[in-house]
């Protein structure tokens, strides 16, 4: 029996999950980028007067909606380009080609520059992590996702302790085997003496 509140359709069947998902209307409100992010990006635009940019509520809403529509429109064409090349995901080249396709080829330069800046910043963070000697417990470079950072020296020390522990365990096992064989030898000698 379906959950309470579900109604039968015209054929008398209860709706399936895919049917329900098709009935949901997705509005632009569901897709909007965070307002604070959009406003901060708008404030980063250099101004000739040097004064701080004030953006009122209506302007920030217009920027938020406009940015969302533009990015979704661009992604639609980037996906089509990727699909025409039998790719499952969009790459940077697909997005740049989509900019040409929608008539915004003048944006290719700034987009490429920002991408290069971002990639350089990521590489710089990786180098800083390597230079600081902080690695995850599993030996990978920490990119800020895990809270447990362990210095490289501690990881090496931990590995050495594990190796020493393994060696000690091997020695203990071999000494136990020796004792067993010696006790078996003594028992066989005693039995031989008793028989004679």
Curated annotation (Swiss-Prot):
Residues 125-196 are annotated as: Disordered. Residues 144-159, 174-188 have a biased composition (Basic and acidic residues). InterPro entries: DNA_Pol-Epsilon_Subunit (IPR051377), Histone-fold (IPR009072). CDD domains: HFD_POLE3_DPB4 (cd22928). It comes from the Eukaryota. GO terms for molecular function: chromatin DNA binding; nucleosomal DNA binding; protein heterodimerization activity. It is found in: Nucleus. As accessory component of the DNA polymerase epsilon (DNA polymerase II) participates in chromosomal DNA replication. It is required during synthesis of the leading and lagging DNA strands at the replication fork and binds at/or near replication origins and moves along DNA with the replication fork. It has 3'-5' proofreading exonuclease activity that correct errors arising during DNA replication. It is also involved in DNA synthesis during DNA repair. In eukaryotes there are five DNA polymerases: alpha, beta, gamma, delta, and epsilon which are responsible for different reactions of DNA synthesis. Present with 2100 molecules/cell in log phase SD medium. This is DNA polymerase epsilon subunit D. It comes from Saccharomyces cerevisiae (strain ATCC 204508 / S288c).
């Amino acid at each position: 029996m379906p959950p309470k509140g579900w109604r039968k359709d015209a054929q008398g069947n209860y709706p399936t999950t895919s049917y329900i998902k098709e009935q949901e209307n997705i509005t632009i409100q569901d897709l909007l980028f965070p307002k604070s992010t959009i406003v901060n990006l708008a404030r980063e635009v250099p101004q000739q007067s040097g004064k701080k940019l004030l953006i009122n509520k209506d302007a920030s809403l217009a920027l938020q909606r406009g940015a969302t529509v533009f990015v979704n429109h661009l992604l639609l064409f980037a996906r089509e380009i990727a699909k025409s090349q039998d790719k499952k995901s969009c790459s940077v080249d697909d997005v740049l080609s989509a900019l040409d396709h929608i008539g915004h080829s003048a944006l290719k330069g700034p987009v490429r520059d920002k991408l290069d800046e971002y990639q350089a910043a990521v590489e710089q963070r990786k180098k800083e992590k390597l230079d600081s000697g902080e690695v995850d417990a599993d030996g990978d470079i920490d990119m800020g996702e895990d809270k447990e950072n362990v210095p490289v020296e501690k990881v090496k020390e931990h590995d050495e302790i594990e190796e020493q522990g393994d060696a000690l365990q091997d020695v203990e096992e071999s000494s136990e085997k020796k004792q067993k064989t010696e006790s078996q030898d003594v028992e066989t000698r005693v039995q031989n003496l008793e028989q004679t």
